[in-house]
A protein has these predicted regions:
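Condensing-enzyme catalytic core mediating Claisen C-C bond formation in acyl metabolism
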Residues: 117-217
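Single conserved hydrophobic/aromatic residue that forms the stacking wall/gate
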Residues: 1-7, 11
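Extended C-terminal subregions enriched in glycine
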Residues: 224-226
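Beta-strand segments within the central parallel beta-sheet cores of soluble alpha/beta enzyme folds
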Residues: 5, 59-63, 85-93, 169-178, ...
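Short acidic, glycine/serine/threonine-rich loops at helix termini
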Residues: 15-18, 73, 98-104, 185-188
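Conserved small-residue
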Residues: 8, 48, 69, 76, ...
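Active-site-proximal alpha-helical scaffold in enzymes
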Residues: 41-45, 49-52, 59-94, 146-168
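Active-site-proximal gating segment of KS-fold condensing enzymes and close homologs
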Residues: 9-59, 102, 106-127
Length: 226
């Protein structure tokens, strides 16, 4: 048996989803029958599972803002380890760039606007005659705020035995998934105690076997924010 698990937090506010549904009366337009269904948070899993893959397996979602992918990875891993399913397609999808959502991010004062980008370029001794938007996001560096983007990510997760059985190309292993809430903190962009607990749990489980020369990929979240 298989399972699909994915979600989106912001995309449903787009024109084809909840955004279009809420705007239709104001714009003197007729609401589409698809507006309501496409506004559901789990549609990135349900639609693909049923109408693209044609699967009759389980489908669901767990949403957790920027950690949505990992919540769904954790759900799939738990089901596989309990022998309830053999494999799962998991992921997340977001397309938040529209006027209303952008206004919401600007209201947090955490987004990189023209004034902040110019100030950052000046701090780096760069020309301030023009804004270099290609360098607005600088991972692990001196940044000026969040840069909005749109993306989706999906992965097929199986047990080791099932992957070998079907001859799948194994790209990585998922021995553990650790997720903790931030806890109380001063701002949404600052790290919370939960972040430190998560990293401590993750590193403590494989640090004894850690070899920096063998690490080919490290993905960190929020590196281009502040």
């Amino acid at each position: 048996p298989g399972h699909s698990s994915a979600a989106s937090d912001v995309y449903k506010r787009q024109e084809k989803g909840l955004g279009g549904l809420m705007q239709s009366r104001l714009q003197n337009k007729r609401a589409s029958s698809k507006h309501l269904s496409m506004s559901l948070i789990e549609m990135s899993a349900d639609f693909i599972n049923a109408y693209i893959l044609g699967s009759v397996g389980k489908s669901g979602q767990v949403a957790g803002a920027c950690a949505t992918f990992f919540y769904n990875l954790n759900a799939a891993s738990t089901l596989i380890k309990s022998d309830e399913i053999d494999y799962a397609v998991i992921g997340s999808a977001e397309a938040p760039i529209n006027p209303e959502v952008t206004d919401g991010f600007f209201a947090t004062t955490g987004i990189a606007d023209d004034k902040k980008i110019i100030a950052m370029q000046e701090r780096h001794g760069e020309s301030i005659e023009d804004i270099d938007f290609s360098k607005a996001c600088r991972p692990f560096g001196d940044n000026c705020g969040l840069v909005l983007g749109e993306s989706s990510q999906f992965a097929v997760v199986t047990s080791l035995e099932f992957a070998i059985k079907i001859g799948a190309e194994i790209l990585c292993a998922v021995p553990h998934v650790f997720i903790n809430s931030d806890g109380i903190k001063k701002s949404i962009s600052s790290p919370g105690i939960g972040n430190y607990i998560t990293m401590a749990q993750a590193f403590s489980n494989y640090i004894k076997d850690f070899d920096s020369k063998k690490q080919t990929c490290v993905i960190a979240h929020g590196t281009g924010t502040f």
